[in-house]
Amino acid sequence: MFFYQRFSNQSFEEEYTKCLDGQIDGVIIVPVDLETTRQFTNKLHERSIPFVLLDSYMPDLRPLSFFGQDSFCSGFFAARMLMLIANEDKQIMLMKQMKDGRVTSKQQANREVGFRHYMHDHFPSTEIVELQLPFNGTRAEYDAALKAFFEEHPQIHNGISLNSRAHIVGDWLLRNNRRDIQIMGYDM
């Protein structure tokens, strides 16, 4: 079994190199990103070694199979659930964690597509206001960003995080006694 540091392309490459040096009959991969994972899967295809993907579906890599959620449908459903409580809101918050100018996972990106699709079809007049937080930010950075966001958008009372970091917002809300804002998230 080989483990890599999540969100580290270098760590992923080091581990897949070790994997390819061994005698393997098949591989189960939790992808890092499309292009880095493609480097590995191209080598697996060259050697006729089958592989399956966990968590992130990347059909372009031609896996034997995929195990995980349908992220588009998940985001679509999340929007539907959020709007049960926010159906009269003019604006809602979409908290995104960013690394190098993009969201940190393919699943999060696909959830957002599903989320926005539902909102476009069912709540086209509700504005989605993004709050972008750095992936490896400090508590002080998060606190400053959240304070500024809610001062700039006092009418926002509902929000969502399409990753497992809703606790960052929830923690800030608790510490600042902001009981007028609800946050929904994944993998809590």
Task: Tell me what each language-model feature is.
Residues F67-M93, Y142-A144, M188:
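Hydrophobic alpha-helical segments within soluble ligand-binding/sensing domains
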Residues F66-S74, V103-N110:
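Alpha-helix N-cap and loop-to-helix initiation/capping positions
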Residues V32, S56-M58, Q97:
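Short, ordered loop/turn segments at secondary-structure junctions
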Residues M1-E14:
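Amphipathic helical "hinge" segments at domain boundaries
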